[in-house]
Amino acid sequence: EEELAPATEAFLSSFKGFRILSEQPLVIEWYTDAYELDAENNVYTMWPAYAGGEAPWHSLAVANLGVLNGELAYTYSKADADGVEWADFISGPSLDILSNSLDKALRTDEIPYLPTLYQYISEEEAAERYANLRNFYANYGHFWVGTGPYYLAGAYKAESVAVLTNYPAYPDEASRWDWLVER
């Protein structure tokens, strides 16, 4: 998507590669020519995220199927240029497209980037994740699956209201970040 090209080109101009050194524990070497004067800004995350935040791989895989089918685009400009829906995970016509893409993923146990990820994602795990995503969509009416202490229980765009609900099984205690609070 052309809108993403400048940021991608800037990234690729300094990115040299990465290497997985171990999986248990996960240790990854990252090679780049870019650096910051403040050392803490030189640490990169390998967590999959996009402009709207973190996302589980199975949500992105479903959206990618919609993009590959020529029904969705990740940016407004690409959606307008191609006459397709913007990939809105919360509301609108894209939900039907995402739902259809999810059905395809469920039928095929789709594993994205198969040559690499088959080592880490089994067909059984893929099937389980897609089934969980189907249940999430049935319960909440959207595909915005979070990874934090809250989940989007409802979204009402006309009213500009989002309802967030505590996710009690979130593994981090609320006190984990207390050390960041100035006293």
Feature map (PLM): residue ranges:
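Polar/charged alpha-helical tracts
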Residues: 119, 124-132, 178
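C-terminal substrate/ligand-recognition segments
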Residues: 130-177, 183
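Glycine-rich loops and low-complexity Gly/Arg-rich segments
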Residues: 55-56, 176-178
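Surface-exposed binding/hinge segments that line
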Residues: 2-125, 147-149, 156-161, 165
